[in-house]
Swiss-Prot record:
Region (Disordered): 53-146
Subcellular location: Mitochondrion outer membrane; Endoplasmic reticulum membrane
UniProt organism field: Debaryomyces hansenii (strain ATCC 36239 / CBS 767 / BCRC 21394 / JCM 1990 / NBRC 0083 / IGC 2968) (Yeast)
Topology in membrane: Peripheral membrane protein
Organism phylogeny: Eukaryota, Fungi, Dikarya, Ascomycota, Saccharomycotina
Record's protein name: Mitochondrial distribution and morphology protein 12
Length: 415
């Protein structure tokens, strides 16, 4: 079975590029800038003409998080507190029986996908890392929905990673786990699909419910081409046509992002000199596992984890975090500099593995400043953070396809 995606028709719609540009600009406007730059904005964006390579790895039912609403969350959180304070053994036994019955009903929902005959099993310690630090606050009110569980409690069973092989995975909040549960960054967790989405909840109930403050999910981005980005509550009931894809996406295309910012010289007085900088972000490299779910005329999208390319410089020990590949070369205006994510980020999903930046400082014919590496590294890291926080699990973005129906209803009411 195959799907044909008309990429040229998708990118020919300028409203889509404009919507993404406005979204990124709003995100950059919301971050705290260091003292040496100001007036940061996104001046241009283009998806480019090169489509990503998409390989479907699994087709099944959507994650339960896409169906949960705020009322259910409040009830579950109250139940979770009750469980943490101590519930009688009889009550716990009853709950376990109910969960076991549910697990049996879903035991055949997920198929086995084997890429390598060498099967490895690794123990997850997702809850330990998540409970150690508080969740990061949203960048803006445009924060999309967030799942209640750790990234793979929905697709891991019995606290083991099962049924997908031959992939180095960088799990959100987990890092790379070996058989003893330690973070090494080099061992290869090889499986991500499971048969028991509640295994982590049963063994560590406090890890399942996380921040679901509805005030964080306000806002909506409307597209002119018939859909809109929305932060509406997930569907509360399952439909017979609901479906979810787990896919591997590999992108190394000609996406272009243009940023403008002023570089400040604060000596001998604050803002003594202001130099305009134009940064062209190109050659974006992404290799990740994603989920795409269709629920009642809405499409949910989220990055689940990175795929670690064995032959890539992304996970070599010599690679430094967000540093130019050619450290000896002087970064002058108009030069291209590559930035790659290094081993320090192995504990989290990065999504952006590599990116190239061309800097223009002052007038194009003049070398106004010889070193803008600090500005470039700051912007690259912020771009990674924005995409990771907004699109990586446990966050997701929802494309609401009901806009045409809403417009028709409004027209009928006016007539």
């Amino acid at each position: 079975m195959s799907f044909d995606i008309n990429w040229s028709e998708l990118v020919s719609d300028e409203s889509l590029n404009e919507s993404i540009k406005e979204f990124l600009d709003n995100q950059f406007q919301s971050i705290s800038l260091p003292s040496f730059i100001d007036n940061l904005s996104v001046s241009d964006f283009s998806l480019g003409n090169s489509p990503p390579e998409i390989t479907i790895r699994h087709i099944g039912d959507p994650f339960d998080d896409f169906y949960e609403d705020e009322g259910d969350d409040d009830e579950k959180e109250r139940k979770n507190v009750y469980m943490q304070q101590g519930v009688s053994e009889d009550t716990n036994s009853s709950d376990d029986d109910e969960d076991d019955e549910y697990d049996g009903d879903r035991s055949n929902d997920l198929s086995i996908i084997t890429e390598d005959p060498n099967i490895h099993t690794f123990t997850s310690e997702a809850d330990r890392s998540r409970l150690a630090s508080p969740p990061r606050p949203p960048l803006t009110d445009l924060r999309r929905s967030r799942a209640s569980s750790d990234p793979f409690s929905l697709i891991m069973g019995n606290n083991n990673l099962n049924y997908m092989h031959n992939y180095n995975m960088n799990y959100v909040g987990l890092g790379n786990l070996n058989a003893t549960g330690t973070h090494t960054g080099t061992d290869t967790p090889t499986n991500i699909l499971n048969q028991n989405p509640y295994a982590t909840l049963k063994s560590n109930p406090s890890s399942y419910y996380k921040n679901k403050d509805p005030s964080k999910f306000s806002g909506s981005d409307t597209h002119k081409n018939g859909f809109r980005l929305t932060s509406k509550e997930p569907c509360s009931t399952r439909g017979e046509n609901d479906i979810q894809l787990i896919a591997e996406v590999k992108y190394n295309g000609d996406l272009h992002l243009e940023l403008t910012v002023n570089l400040l010289v604060n000596y001998p007085s604050p803002n003594f000199i202001s130099l305009p900088i134009k940064l062209h972000v190109t050659d974006l490299v992404i290799h990740s596992i994603i989920t795409i779910a269709y629920l009642k005329n809405s499409v949910f999208f989220s990055f689940l984890c990175d795929v670690n390319d064995i032959n890539s410089d992304y996970f070599t020990s010599s690679t430094q975090n967000s540093t130019p590949e050619h450290m000896g070369a002087t970064n002058t205006g108009g030069n291209f500099v590559d930035y790659v994510s290094g081993p320090i980020n192995r504990e989290r999903i990065d999504i952006i593995k590599k990116v190239k930046i061309e800097s223009e400082i002052g007038e194009a014919e003049q070398n106004a400043l010889r070193n803008v590496g600090k500005v470039e590294r700051f912007l690259v890291e912020q771009l990674r953070n924005i995409i990771r926080d907004e699109f990586a699990w446990p966050s997701w973005v929802c494309f609401d396809l009901n806009e045409d129906d809403d417009d028709e209803s409004d027209d009928q009411e006016e007539n």
